[in-house]
Amino acid sequence: MKKILLAIMISSTTAACAQQFISSGTIEFEVRTNNHRALGDEGFWVDMFKDKIPQFSNTYYQYTFNDNKSIYKFERFDEKNKLPRGFGMSNPEDDVWYNDYSTGTFTNYRYILGDNYLLSGALMNIEWKLTPTETRDIAGFNCRKATGIIFDSVYVFAFYTDEITVSGGPMGINGLPGMILGLTIPRMFTSYIATKLQVSGVDVRAVTPPQKGKKKDLASLQKDALRVTKDWGKYGQQALWMMSL
């Protein structure tokens, strides 16, 4: 009996030592969007747009994190299904999201409605429901499922790992006990999936808030955008959600 207990203790200690906890690194996210579904089916202009853009597009973003802070920005397009520049309200090449999870604040640089803005404020407070029994392997990490609600009624489905200690994820999504490596927003017809993680040779000096752009309150910018998108049909709501993430 003593031998069995000793074996269990050794096994548990070995497993604990083997588990890694990562607080600094760079994650590549692949973002896949069904553009035709996002456009909806309201108005003659929708069919015109659908003829000019790919049904699906893949865009890659770089998420660098250190000291409980992160910066998320454009990396590259998949040239086979690249959207034309200027489609929608913003250009992904220009946008930068900086989050400080210790203070619960963000500073974002966004190109919206033809101008560059520096936005800052409090991170979204997302109510999460954890489903730890449902797991998925993403980029070599065992991730647990969680369901949250943003913008009052928009469900998001996330898979996170507690092996990466930063409580973050793509854009402003946050608040789970670990890093979000998989995210789906069905009503936005978009998914985010981590494809790789780099922990060595990462330039953590890049994790600094953007400085340029016109300072503006997000709520005020949302009002301006609402006036512009009021005739855009369902896609107008999509654009407003994307602007607010």
Residue ranges and their predicted role:
Residues 14-18:
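Sec/Tat signal peptide C-region and signal peptidase I cleavage site
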Residues 20-245:
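Extended soluble regions of mature proteins
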Residues 4-13:
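Sec-dependent N-terminal signal peptides
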